[in-house]
Amino acid sequence: MSCRLPERIAATCLLASLALPALAQHPEALNWCDALAQRLRSVEAESCRKLGMEPGKLRSVQGRPLMIRDVPAAPVKLSALKTESGKPVPQRPARIFIIGGIHGDELTSVSIVFRWMDWLGEAEARHYHWRIAPLSNPDGLLARPSRRTNGNGVDLNRNFPTPDWFAKALPYWAQRTGKDPRRFPGEKPMSEPETRWLHEEIERFKPDVIVSIHAPYGILDYDGPAQEPRRFGRLNLNRLGVYPGSLGNFGGVHKNIPVITIELPNAAAMPSPRDQRLIWDDMLAWIRKHIVPHTLS
C-alpha cells in the first residue's frame, strides 16, 4: 500500500497499515465503556476497553470521568524523508485533536469518533499525532433523555473564554435565543469542568488542527487560518458564523488554530459506512495538503 505524506514523500515509508495494538485498560475505562455501550448501539464495550482511554484530571459536573486517548505518530527515519520538491519533512508530526459529544443529544457525534478510531492504525493516519476526546459531555449523553447541555444546564459550546464573552455571551443568549435553556452559556466563561478540561487539553497538546463533531445540519463549518475545506464526503462548506463562547471562535479566531466543525446530517442515525469513510478520507487529504506544524519539537 502506498503511503501519502505532504507532497507525496518520495522516500521509503516505514509505516505499516496495521491495527494498533490493544492497550492496557484503565480501571475507570471499564465502567465508562459499559455505560457508553448501553447508550450507543454503535459502541461495543469490549472493543472500547481495548482503546487505552485515560481519564483526565477533571471530572464532569456529575462526577463522571472525562476520557481521552492519545495516539502518537508512528516512528519514521526522518533523515530519509523528503518531499517531491526536495524539502525536508517537518520533524514533528502534525497534531490533530478530535472532539466529539460536546452536545449530549448529538449521539452520532460520539459514535463516528469511535468508528474513526478503528482506522487510526492505517498508514495515512499514522503520519499524525492524534488526541481524541470522543465524549466531552458524558452527563448530557447519559441523561434520560439525552440533552444538549451538561449537568449544570450549560451549553459547553458557548462556555469557552473568547475575548467577547463578557460583552456578548449573555446578551446574545437573551436577545437572539430568547433565553433558550438549551443554549445557556453559563454565568462566566469556563465555569464548567468539561470546558476547563478541553481548554487544558488544547493548551497542553498544542494541536495544529481541531476537529469538532456535531449534528444535525449536514454541513462543514470552519474557523481559523489555513485554506478552508470545501467538502468532506457529502458535507459541503457552509459557514455558520461566529458565536460568543464557541469552540470555533475560541480556537479558530482567538487562538489561531484551524477548527473544522463537522455537522453530521442526523443526530441519531449514523451516515452510511461509505459516507463515514468519505468524510474521513477527505479530512485526511485536507490535513495532508494544508496542515503543517507551526513549530518543531
Indicate residue ranges for each PLM-predicted region.
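Conserved beta-strand scaffold positions in the cores of enzyme catalytic domains, especially
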Residues: P55, I68, I132, I210, ...
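Active-site/substrate-binding loop(s) of hydrolase catalytic cores
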Residues: T83, R92-P93, F97, E106-R239
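N-terminal signal peptide c-region/cleavage motif recognized by signal peptidases
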Residues: A19-P21
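Bacterial N-terminal signal peptides that target proteins for export
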Residues: S2-A10
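Short glycine- and acidic-rich boundary segments immediately preceding or forming the N-terminal edge
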Residues: A24-R69
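Short beta-strand-to-loop junctions in surface cap/lid or active-site-entrance loops
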Residues: I68-R92
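Active-site-adjacent mobile loop/cap segments within catalytic or ligand-binding domains
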Residues: I219-D223, R231-F232, P244-S297
